[in-house]
């Protein structure tokens, strides 16, 4: 394969592609720009961090919503723990939010984008 540029963060997923059951520690971070529509007056950036057990997502840096799911108890993500967080959920959300803030911006890009491509 190609050598990644030194400026690119991350690590190869090749071991997981070869063996999906291989040990993997760490987190996965994703971002998605949700365009304005009937429900949203303006675009909002969503960003997520996923550990082996948890997925934390905030929309518009938390101003447009927050989600927390415990994949050990709720692998299909039916119960958003951020809606009524207990002490453990509050602690997890704070820890994951801090990690996420270091890696991904919650701001909507200022450059023009084509919503039809989303």
Enumerate the predicted regions with their spans.
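Short, polar/flexible loop-turn hinges at active-site or ligand-entry regions and domain interfaces
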Residues: 1-5, 82-86
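Short clusters of small/polar residues that mark proteolytic maturation junctions
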Residues: 60, 80-82
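Short amphipathic alpha-helical coupling segments at ligand-binding clamshell hinges
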Residues: 92-96
């Amino acid at each position: 394969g190609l050598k990644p540029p030194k400026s690119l963060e991350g690590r190869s997923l090749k071991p997981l592609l070869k063996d999906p059951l291989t040990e993997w520690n760490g987190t996965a971070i994703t971002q998605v720009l949700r365009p304005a529509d009937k429900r949203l007056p303006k675009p909002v950036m969503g960003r997520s961090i996923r550990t082996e057990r948890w997925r934390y997502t905030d929309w518009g840096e938390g101003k447009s919503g927050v989600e927390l799911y415990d994949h050990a108890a709720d692998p299909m993500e039916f119960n958003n723990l951020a809606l009524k967080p207990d002490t453990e959920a509050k602690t997890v959300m704070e820890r994951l939010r801090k990690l996420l803030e270091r890696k991904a911006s919650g701001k909507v890009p200022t450059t023009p984008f084509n919503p039809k491509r989303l």
